């Protein structure tokens, strides 16, 4: 009768076998082969080597010379890596670190130990930074590890400005260096950094590298270099740049700089990064094109070039069902908050505020960042690396009540903390950040004094939050109590645009749609009026803005011209230059959705975005 061993007994059986093999190695029992690397000898067992390594299995079973040799010499493999791999075979422990991971990976690759190589590869990916990505890239290329090569190349190009400051880049060969500085894909904002890098690389070994200087200078886009920087480089590197060919290259660059219209050099990736208006939403009908559906995309606009782009919508896949609000953090991370999709809600016990962030390079998708206790009509703000969910309407004991609670989320620590509450309960308010302080503006606040009237009053209050003190203070009030307005920060001043409201404190007087622009100066704690909008305009959501600031100018993307939510929205983009104090329509019939939700401003690269469909571009009509 056969008795099968299962579960814990089977595990114990395997453990016993491993322990006995370990003991045999330690006692040098039944040793039948010795590996030699860098002169160091490693007694071991052919059976163990063959079990873990197809390379050794083939060596010991295919009639090769080593079949009958007691000693096998391993060339181009370090003794340390052999020791690490044998320890893994006999002890089930892989001891890798930053110093040895490449040599261990190389040995594992040589011995065809795929599991070990995969662990080493993951370790290098997880520990990649600006100081080592270049070495990882060339290592991966050398052994043909495509995944690692692709990942390290993306990291290298994306972080090239930081990589260029490390010693590792000064050690690479001239052909490798040339390939790098030729690339259009380097994420650098100024060509001066490439010129500086070329001179540092040559100076690192003048005797051998000066001969390559002319060839290297030809790859620097000198016409993009500031003339004063170029003159300074000449003065500091007289001995290097005195070669006649170098002088010709530099003189031609000076001539080209004076007449830039005659030249059209390719910009590098980082030079194309610019501030864009992002109208992020998830209208399921979306923009329809003969070529494809843009329902899963959100509208982007470059006010400088007047070009349109799209990014993926946070509704893609099983993302957000509704986008309620958003914010762009100090480090340019794009955040949106809303409610889960219907399919996702059906599988959840509790309804939450779902918060997502966008990956903008190489992985154009939204990922879930965190969730917060469910509420509606809240505001979302940020200071440094922290998010703040402020006020809103919460369900408490089966009643929807407006709250004053404020929750802070640390992206770095991945935790929530309740901070000092608002001085009053608020919903449908807005929040902006100026000089590392939050400013909460307008909204609704409940009133209990007059039960026969509206249950809520509009607020004209401005509240300031100082995170260093965890304290709120009341600042100068607005002229109008309002909600459904848009906000933006221009030149460190807060602009509040349009909305529904009434003059002064809301005491039940008639409310109307506003074309009013109110501007707050945080330094002086005072408000002034700006130029009225061309017509009364409401934001597209009660707690989100459809305005943003780019290069010191204010832009409003669409909006409602009346209080009826069912009206067709305006598809115009308005521009206000604070110096001219006048509104201009800069685009009409733009390719935004019939209904979008949140307007944000972020620095993005058009290369990472989705171009508009050609048939809709033809239909579009811009000023």
Curated annotation (Swiss-Prot):
InterPro entries: BACK, BTB-kelch_protein, BTB/POZ_dom, Kelch-typ_b-propeller, Kelch_1, SKP1/BTB/POZ_sf. Keywords: Kelch repeat, Repeat. Residues 133-235 form the BACK domain. GO terms for cellular component: Cul3-RING ubiquitin ligase complex; cytoplasm. Kelch repeats lie at residues 386-436, 437-492, 494-547, 553-603. Residues 31-98 form the BTB domain. The keyword Repeat applies. Signal peptide: none annotated. Gene3D superfamilies: 1.25.40.420, Kelch-type beta propeller, Potassium Channel Kv1.1, Chain A. GO terms for biological process: proteasome-mediated ubiquitin-dependent protein catabolic process. GO terms for molecular function: ubiquitin-like ligase-substrate adaptor activity. It comes from the Eukaryota. PANTHER family: KELCH PROTEIN, KELCH REPEAT AND BTB DOMAIN-CONTAINING PROTEIN 12. This is Kelch repeat and BTB domain-containing protein 12. It comes from Homo sapiens (Human). The lineage of its organism: Eukaryota, Metazoa, Chordata, Craniata, Vertebrata.
């Amino acid at each position: 009768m056969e008795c099968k061993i299962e579960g814990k007994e089977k595990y114990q059986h395997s453990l016993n076998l491993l322990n006995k093999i370990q003991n045999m190695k330690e006692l040098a029992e039944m040793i039948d082969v010795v590996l030699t690397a860098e002169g160091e000898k490693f007694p071991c067992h052919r059976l163990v080597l063959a079990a873990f390594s197809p390379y050794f299995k083939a060596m010991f079973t295919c009639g090769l010379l080593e079949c009958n040799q007691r000693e096998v010499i391993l060339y181009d493999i370090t003794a340390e890596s052999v020791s690490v791999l044998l320890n893994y075979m006999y002890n089930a422990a892989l001891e890798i670190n930053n110093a040895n991971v490449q040599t261990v990976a190389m040995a594992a690759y040589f011995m065809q130990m795929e599991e070990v190589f995969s662990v080493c590869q993951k370790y290098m990916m997880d520990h990649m930074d600006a100081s080592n990505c270049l070495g990882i890239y060339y290592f991966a290329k050398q052994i043909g590890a495509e995944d690692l090569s692709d990942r390290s190349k993306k990291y290298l190009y994306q972080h090239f400005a930081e990589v260029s400051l490390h010693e590792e880049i000064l050690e690479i060969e001239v052909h490798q260096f040339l390939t790098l500085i030729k690339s259009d894909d380097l994420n650098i904002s100024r060509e001066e950094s490439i010129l500086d890098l070329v001179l540092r690389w040559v100076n690192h070994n003048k005797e051998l590298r000066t001969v390559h200087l002319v060839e290297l200078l030809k790859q620097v886009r000198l016409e993009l270099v500031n003339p004063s920087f170029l003159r300074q480089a000449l003065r500091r590197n007289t001995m290097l740049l005195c070669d006649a060919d170098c002088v010709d290259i530099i003189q031609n660059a000076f001539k080209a700089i004076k007449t830039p219209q005659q030249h059209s050099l390719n910009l590098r990736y980082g030079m194309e990064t610019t501030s864009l208006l992002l109208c992020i939403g998830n209208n399921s009908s979306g923009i329809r094109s003969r070529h494809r559906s843009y329902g899963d995309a959100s509208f982007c606009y470059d006010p400088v070039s007047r070009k349109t782009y799209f990014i993926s919508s946070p509704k893609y896949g099983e993302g957000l069902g509704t986008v309620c609000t958003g914010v762009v953090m100090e480090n340019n991370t794009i955040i949106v908050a809303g409610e889960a999709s219907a399919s996702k809600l059906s599988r959840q016990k509790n309804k939450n505020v779902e918060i997502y962030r966008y990956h903008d390079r190489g992985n154009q998708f939204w990922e879930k960042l965190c969730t917060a206790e469910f509420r509606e009509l809240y505001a979302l703000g940020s200071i440094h690396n922290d998010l703040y969910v402020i006020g809103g309407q919460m369900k408490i004991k089966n009643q929807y009540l407006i709250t004053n609670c404020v929750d802070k989320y640390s992206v770095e620590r991945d935790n929530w903390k309740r901070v000092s509450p608002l001085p009053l309960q608020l919903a449908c308010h807005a929040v902006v950040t100026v000089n590392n302080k939050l400013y909460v503006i307008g909204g609704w606040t409940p009133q209990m004094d007059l039960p026969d009237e509206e249950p809520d009053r509009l607020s004209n209050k401005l509240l300031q939050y100082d995170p260093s003190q965890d304290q709120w203070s009341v600042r100068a009030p607005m002229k109008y109590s309002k909600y459904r307005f848009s906000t933006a920060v221009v030149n460190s001043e807060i602009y509040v645009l349009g909305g529904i409201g009434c003059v002064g404190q809301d005491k039940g007087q008639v409310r109307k749609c506003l074309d009013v622009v109110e501007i707050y100066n945080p330094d002086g704690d005072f408000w002034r009026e700006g130029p009225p909008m061309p017509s009364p305009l409401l934001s597209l959501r009660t707690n989100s803005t459809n305005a943003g600031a780019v290069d010191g100018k204010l832009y409003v993307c669409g909006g409602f011209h009346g209080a009826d939510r069912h009206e067709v929205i305006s598809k115009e983009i308005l521009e206000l230059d604070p110096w001219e104090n006048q509104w201009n329509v800069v685009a009409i019939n733009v390719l935004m959705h019939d209904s979008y939700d949140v307007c944000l401003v972020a620095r993005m690269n058009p290369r990472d975005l989705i171009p508009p469909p050609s048939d809709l571009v033809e239909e579009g009509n811009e000023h």
